A protein has these predicted regions:
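Conserved H-loop
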Residues: 29
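Short beta-strand->loop micro-motif that forms the acidic, two-metal-ion catalytic signature
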Residues: 42-46
Length: 109
């Protein structure tokens, strides 16, 4: 398992590397406080625009790097417009992250 200091450091690396970061959200078991030794780290990056999601994903995964032995990273990237639209729909991952996630970076007014 990893601690919040390690998670916040990973989020800071994402913010530094992202093209137009508006929000970084921790979701899943680490956000709920139910993480165990087999848990991965679920992070969502919201950017103003994401013209090439695949390229941005590769850049951000490189920036996050290896968190800790045996800890995988699930990284999701969404443009702000999609986050705002689909984050209102119950049952979606965006809704879960928006309602239960922990915001680690917020540049929205």
């Amino acid at each position: 398992m990893i601690d919040m200091e390690t998670i916040r450091a990973a989020a800071a690396r994402l913010v530094a590397a992202a093209t137009s970061p508006t929000r970084v959200i921790l979701f899943g078991s680490y956000a709920r406080g139910t993480a165990d030794e087999g848990s991965d780290l679920d992070l969502m990056v919201i950017e103003r625009e994401v013209p090439d999601r695949a390229a941005e994903y590769m850049r951000l995964m490189d920036a996050v790097g290896r968190i800790a032995p045996g800890v995988g990273v699930d990284l999701l990237i969404y443009p702000l417009s999609e986050y705002e639209r689909r984050g209102q729909v119950p049952g979606t991952l965006l809704f879960e992250a928006r309602s239960e996630g922990q915001v680690l970076h917020d540049a929205l007014p």
